[in-house]
From Swiss-Prot:
<dbReference type="InterPro" id="IPR043472">
    <property type="entry name" value="Macro_dom-like"/>
</dbReference>
<feature type="binding site">
    <location>
        <begin position="33"/>
        <end position="35"/>
    </location>
    <ligand>
        <name>substrate</name>
    </ligand>
</feature>
<dbReference type="GO" id="GO:0061463">
    <property type="term" value="F:O-acetyl-ADP-ribose deacetylase activity"/>
</dbReference>
<dbReference type="InterPro" id="IPR002589">
    <property type="entry name" value="Macro_dom"/>
</dbReference>
<comment type="subunit">
    <text>Homodimer. Interacts with RNase III.</text>
</comment>
<feature type="active site" description="Proton acceptor">
    <location>
        <position position="35"/>
    </location>
</feature>
<feature type="binding site">
    <location>
        <begin position="122"/>
        <end position="126"/>
    </location>
    <ligand>
        <name>substrate</name>
    </ligand>
</feature>
<dbReference type="GO" id="GO:0008428">
    <property type="term" value="F:ribonuclease inhibitor activity"/>
</dbReference>
<protein>
    <recommendedName>
        <fullName>O-acetyl-ADP-ribose deacetylase</fullName>
        <ecNumber>3.1.1.106</ecNumber>
    </recommendedName>
</protein>
<feature type="binding site">
    <location>
        <position position="25"/>
    </location>
    <ligand>
        <name>substrate</name>
    </ligand>
</feature>
<dbReference type="Pfam" id="PF01661">
    <property type="entry name" value="Macro"/>
</dbReference>
<dbReference type="GO" id="GO:0042278">
    <property type="term" value="P:purine nucleoside metabolic process"/>
</dbReference>
<feature type="domain" description="Macro">
    <location>
        <begin position="1"/>
        <end position="175"/>
    </location>
</feature>
<feature type="binding site">
    <location>
        <begin position="11"/>
        <end position="12"/>
    </location>
    <ligand>
        <name>substrate</name>
    </ligand>
</feature>
<comment type="function">
    <text>Deacetylates O-acetyl-ADP ribose to yield ADP-ribose and free acetate. Down-regulates ribonuclease 3 (RNase III) activity. Acts by interacting directly with the region of the ribonuclease that is required for dimerization/activation.</text>
</comment>
<keyword id="KW-0378">Hydrolase</keyword>
<dbReference type="InterPro" id="IPR024900">
    <property type="entry name" value="O-Ac-ADP-ribose_deAcase"/>
</dbReference>
Amino acid sequence: MTSRLQVIQGDITQLSVDAIVNAANASLMGGGGVDGAIHRAAGPALLDACKLIRQQQGECQTGHAVITPAGKLSAKAVIHTVGPVWRGGEHQEAELLEEAYRNCLLLAEANHFRSIAFPAISTGVYGYPRAQAAEVAVRTVSDFITRYALPEQVYFVCYDEETARLYARLLTQQGDDPA
């Protein structure tokens, strides 16, 4: 049986999956890093969908997740989540990051998505240490998929080789084959 968890090094905007996760900011209006890359690749329809969500419910709070159509992306949808800003680890950062991953997975499950791709949430300008963030991500996703049938496939999409090796090592340590 192949693992439901896989590590990919590359550009998350190029994946043909049911849902791509966007490491968004609270405004949902795009920004730097993966957030900006997803908005640019998806085109103006994504920004319009995000504006509509803001009009309906305001900003997206840390740990929460919302879903939009994917615009020009190959994915069916984009799930936007706001990860925590790293403030030394004493301000519930791990719990909030766990909540962000779990809420994305719950949206994927509720929408009957078979596949989802995650970036390394909060590790860019939000400053979350990569190794600690990866541990939270792998633990949270692994726990979720033992309880739910969907999504069937979860991808950790890493921009660089070092981060990809980190995720692969964590998956191997827990008995998964990340390839």
